[in-house]
Amino acid sequence: MNKLFLFTLLVTLWSVKGFTYEEKKQAFCSLPKVYQIRLLDCLIDRGSENDKEVVNAVYKCMNEHSDVDGKADAMMKAVCNEEIFATNRNLILCMLVNPPKLEHSERTNDDDLEAVKYCLVNG
């Protein structure tokens, strides 16, 4: 029952635009790691090409300069452990040298919100 309540709360957090990025991040980072990874795997699969470029760039650098278990784990650590960038100069340099190649996208915030809702419910 607690898991159902938690997922319902997260769907509400992402659906209501009144919550700040920090509040959403705090809710996400308080999830057990297994649910964070599951949610991120789904979001990566359903993300835009630009989203995938960012994920690939973060994963490449995190994999070279930190201990990660895949793309979702790299993103989870980048979002929930921001101090990793403050304490690892090689990671920062890698991100500066290998920025993601972003292109114009017709994808809207509503498309992203639908992906988040889908992954929170079906993830």
UniProtKB/Swiss-Prot annotation:
Tissue: Expressed by the venom gland.
Entry keyword annotation includes ATP-binding: no
Keyword RNA-binding attached: no
GO cellular component: extracellular region
Keywords linked to the UniProt accession: Disulfide bond, Secreted, Signal
Signal peptide: 1-18
Coarse class of the protein's main subcellular location: secreted
PTM comment, free text: Contains 3 disulfide bonds.
Compartment(s) of residence: Secreted
Protein name: Venom protein 29
